[in-house]
Amino acid sequence: MSSLFRHIPSVDRFLQDLEQDRALADLPRQMLKDLVAEFLDLCREEIRAGVVTDESALAFTTLAARAGAYVRTRSRPHFRRVVNATGVVIHTNLGRSILAEEAVLAVAEGCRHYSNLEMDLDTGQRGSRYSHVEKLLCRLTGAEAGLVVNNNAAAVLLVLDTLAKGREVVVSRGQLVEIGGSFRIPEVMKKSGAVLREVGATNRTHLRDYAEAIGPDTAMLMKVHTSNYRIIGFHKEVDLPDLVALGRERGLSTFEDLGSGNLFDFSPYGFMPEPTVQQVLRSGVDVVTFSGDKLLGGPQAGVIVGRREFIERIKKNQLNRALRIDKMTLAALEATLRLYLDPEQARRTVPTLAMITAAPKELHARAGRLRRRLSRDLAGLASVAVKPGFSRVGGGSFPEQDLSTTLVSVAPTGMDVDSLRQGLLAEDIPVVGRVEDGAFCLDPRTLMDAEFALVAGAMKAVLAR
């Protein structure tokens, strides 16, 4: 074994070889040196573990090829672009919504230059960062006032901390949802200092349940929109206008967490009814919160809208500063909201809306173009076909809605489909799809036409290895 260690070349010899690699030309020399040292430590560990037992495996040409691959892989940015071919539009693991081009340009402009983030250009005095989107939010939703924090969980936390800290909040037992990542409404409420008062049963809650729970310590009646699941069958929940009327009768504030709330009415496109923010506010509810990066199709943000007296109190909460959004999020959100001033323009230009409302005929045509491209580029490496399938909205939205689509199915001939899947994840720009019936499937709903060539190149590179 000791003789094998002597066959491992020096770091300097590898550096001389790798510094000729144009793909590594921009890599700082010290980082290159450190990565080569890591690779050589790995080689020594392979000898100790008995993985390498023959000196032929330690030939310089063999090790140099491995070292190059190791350095290229380890030196890539950890946060990277991926191609989403899963058909899940608001894919939580892949960054949820992608931004409209107008929002991307607004972010770039705000980053390259100074901005009026907190300056009132009319007076030359200090202004509020919330002013950039508050009027837009009010115009689009009908709210009296609004503000934005860094995500919807933060929005819920801030509302409860401001309006109900140390007092009871009455919520239906069937609405104590988990919002993802093990974050649950009861835990968020506990952190806010509010006291949870559950009423009703999991499947049925009546207005009298809320009324009977109200006592001297009650501060708020809360409703949580269960956008990420449905209870069907023997089920009843209280309509928001009735809850609002009860709150006003008893002198209590009312609050609805819409979760992945939307400003766009999807029902004309065959979707089941889903309340819009505008509809919810028309019920008279005092405060509504919703996400920015789900059905809205903007950046991650928690939007709070409602009656001015409550929003002003929330703005003054010291916790608000810890939860406030930055200039890049504000730039992206304002640009996204401006598109909603014309709903049809929003449907066409906000990628999330365009993907969700894409017509089956359009998707079938795009799948055909992708199939022809892959059939040509992967000839002899895989069989390519199209088949009917379903996409999903994702992001905890429309959980029962299957979206008809046309899938492109790739069945490799020289490797198993899981090896193809893993190989695509290891590409410089990973391609994420789904495996069905022994084939790797691509859904054109979440693919851009400009990505067809990239997908074809990645698949060819993996299948030809």
Swiss-Prot record:
InterPro entries the record matches: PyrdxlP-dep_Trfase, PyrdxlP-dep_Trfase_major, SelA-like, SelA_trans, SelA_trans_N_dom
GO term, biological process aspect, one: conversion of seryl-tRNAsec to selenocys-tRNAsec
Keyword Cytoplasm: yes
UniProt catalytic activity: L-seryl-tRNA(Sec) + selenophosphate + H(+) = L-selenocysteinyl-tRNA(Sec) + phosphate
Main location: cytoplasm
Modification N6-(pyridoxal phosphate)lysine occurs at: 294
PANTHER family assigned to the protein according to its UniProt record, in alphabetical order: L-SERYL-TRNA(SEC) SELENIUM TRANSFERASE
Its job: Converts seryl-tRNA(Sec) to selenocysteinyl-tRNA(Sec) required for selenoprotein biosynthesis.
Protein name listed in UniProt: L-seryl-tRNA(Sec) selenium transferase
Organism: Desulfomicrobium baculatum (Desulfovibrio baculatus)
